[in-house]
Design a protein with these regions (language model features):
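Short proline/glycine-enriched turn/loop segments at secondary-structure junctions
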Residues: 146-147
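Ferredoxin-type iron-sulfur electron-transfer modules and their immediate structural context
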Residues: 1-75, 82-84, 88-140, 153-162
């Protein structure tokens, strides 16, 4: 019932509440999509090893964020948090025209992976073989392969690797 009050628009929560006979919660909390399951925090720290996100606050004020409320500088933009989130509230996109503003008024434009929730802009690498920019591979795909990776795995795009 408390999850339903916190995240009434999350489909998985509505279905679970209906199965439990809860149509409308007695409490009102807000409209936060995050259900605080902790899967994103767990996969980031235990499986990926980046420790880029954590819980902050206590009780009703608890939420997931980057440490010290800043950009998640340890984030490798792998997408593991996006993949495990049952509420689908973590957003990530690959863009070719990402802009970063630096002190002094300069602007850097290029291809990058953006993780909106953690305020991360992860620049794509240039392929050593063909020179084209490519996004970082997903650690989930790497774990599924279950075999040692070649030394230049992260320096060559998928097309040149085939």
């Amino acid at each position: 019932e408390l999850l339903m009050a916190r995240s009434p628009h999350v489909k998985a929560i509505r279905e679970y509440a209906a199965a439990m006979g809860i149509e409308k919660p007695r409490f009102t909390r807000g409209n936060d999509k995050c259900i605080l399951c902790g899967l994103c925090v767990h996969v980031c720290s235990e499986y990926v090893g980046a420790h880029a996100i954590t819980f902050s606050g206590r009780g009703a004020e608890k939420f997931v964020c980057a440490p010290l409320y800043r950009s998640a500088t340890d984030c490798i933009a792998c997408g593991a948090c996006v993949a495990v989130c049952p509420a689908q509230c973590i957003t990530m996109e690959d863009v070719t025209d990402a802009k970063t503003y630096v002190p002094g008024g300069a602007e850097e434009v290029g291809s990058a992976r953006l993780v909106h929730n953690w305020n991360v802009r992860f620049p794509w690498k240039q392929c050593k073989s063909c020179g084209k920019p490519f996004p970082p591979p997903s650690p989930i795909e790497l774990m599924e392969q279950g075999k040692p990776l070649p030394k230049d795995f992260f320096a060559i795009c998928d097309n040149c690797r085939k």
